[in-house]
């Protein structure tokens, strides 16, 4: 397992590492499990640079669905890798039709990347070669006869995603409550049920109890958090820079149990203050 990063570049980097360590050229079914907004599409782009997703959070990219057009493919130049978002495609096709298309692609020696794999598994009858769950943590498994089953990953990643969303929103609220100079000086890190703000060179002049009080006041105001573009969110209507704009709670009031460590910790290895 890995802590699921929240910034886009961090997820891309982790995707590349996962591909190098766990992906095999013999894998035909690669299943992803996780709620919308958990970062599955970004992780897939990191694992498979240059892949054209049939759809993502921005809309539909490829139509008709290439997986369902296999019978019309002729000659040498046919796709080797297909992408399939089960939750999205069930709005247009029956699950049984999609399962038949996946089985045909496997027989033809193709590779299929399937989002929301847990929805098609009961009809497919076979598990994925590589099964990845995305929640607060990224869980990577290579199932065998004894499991794990997709539902086991669902039980882990679906409940845990809420902590990741809360941590990311709280992280951005801290930045929002800082001065511009302090915000530009810090970088982000990931820990379980929380976040890390790191400062290089010298300890910042930040009154931590005051910063915590400011953030708790923003939480009490229950400000809406909305997607603006791929690099910004709207925090109570104010534009704020963010590299993971879809990985947030809907409003600040949904952040529960926020608090900050009341002192800085010096990391002697990286020479940073946290």
Where are these regions (language model features)?
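Glycine-rich phosphate-binding P-loop
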Residues: 28-52
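Active-/binding-site microenvironments in catalytic and ligand-binding cores
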Residues: 148-274
């Amino acid at each position: 397992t890995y802590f699921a990063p929240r910034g886009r570049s961090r997820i891309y980097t982790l995707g590349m590492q996962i591909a190098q360590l766990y992906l095999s050229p013999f894998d035909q079914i690669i299943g992803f499990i996780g709620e919308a907004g958990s970062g599955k599409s970004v992780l897939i782009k990191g694992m498979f640079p240059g892949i054209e997703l049939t759809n993502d959070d921005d809309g539909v990219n490829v139509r008709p669905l290439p997986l369902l057009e296999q019978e019309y493919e002729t000659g040498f130049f046919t796709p080797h890798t297909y992408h399939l978002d089960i939750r999205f495609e069930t709005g247009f096709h029956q699950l049984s039709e999609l399962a038949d298309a996946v089985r045909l692609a496997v027989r033809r020696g193709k590779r299929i990347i399937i989002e929301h794999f847990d929805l098609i598994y009961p009809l497919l009858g076979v598990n994925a070669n590589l099964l990845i769950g995305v929640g607060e943590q990224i869980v990577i498994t290579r199932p065998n006869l004894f499991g794990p089953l997709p539902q086991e990953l669902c039980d882990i990643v679906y409940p845990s995603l809420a902590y990741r969303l809360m941590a990311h929103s709280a992280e951005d609220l801290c930045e929002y409550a800082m001065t511009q100079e302090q915000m530009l000086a810090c970088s982000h890190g990931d820990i379980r049920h929380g976040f890390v703000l790191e400062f290089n060179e010298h300890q910042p002049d930040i009154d931590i109890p005051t910063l915590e009080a400011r953030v708790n006041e923003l939480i009490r105001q229950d400000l809406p958090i909305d997607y603006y573009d791929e690099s910004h969110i709207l925090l109570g209507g104010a534009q704020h820079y963010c590299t993971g704009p879809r990985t947030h709670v809907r409003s600040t009031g949904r952040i529960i149990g926020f608090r900050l460590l009341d002192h800085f910790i010096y990391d002697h290895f990286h020479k940073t203050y946290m």
